[in-house]
Amino acid sequence: MMTEISVPLIFTDAAANKVKALISEEENPNLKLRVYITGGGCSGFQYGFTFDEKVNDGDLTIEKSGVHLVIDPMSLQYLIGGTVDYTEGLEGSRFVVNNPNASTTCGCGSSFSI
């Protein structure tokens, strides 16, 4: 019997599939999507996404569909219980974070406050 391990952040199929497509375009299977939090934006904190080849000590790695999402420990504390997704809409296509810890978010959804 397999046991379900609680993952502190959900990495959706849509996000994983887009990461897989982008990695394929770059022809570098070592790339991982890193999500991080920085100070700034209109609400105090903002989300960032970048591709990274390395995993640092203390980073959390979530695997889905053969690709990896990496989060540093400082950012993770603000993201616990959230969802990393990929959307296509009027604002264009982008990775987004749905964060239940955010008390307010800006209109574009890229910054938040606790």
From Swiss-Prot:
Q: So where does iron-sulfur cluster get bound?
A: 42, 106, 108
Q: Does the keyword Iron apply?
A: yes
* Signal sequence extent: none
Q: Which cofactor does it need?
A: iron-sulfur cluster
Entry keywords, A to Z: Iron, Iron-sulfur, Metal-binding
Q: Can you quote the record's cofactor note? A: Binds 1 iron-sulfur cluster per subunit.
Q: Which is a GO BP term held by this UniProt record?
A: iron-sulfur cluster assembly
- GO molecular function annotation: 2 iron, 2 sulfur cluster binding; 4 iron, 4 sulfur cluster binding; iron ion binding
Q: How does it assemble?
A: Homodimer.
The entry assigns this protein to a family as follows: Belongs to the HesB/IscA family.
Question: What is the role of this chain?
Answer: Required for insertion of 4Fe-4S clusters for at least IspG.
From the Swiss-Prot or TrEMBL record, give the protein name.
Iron-sulfur cluster insertion protein ErpA
Q: Which gene does this sequence derive from? A: erpA
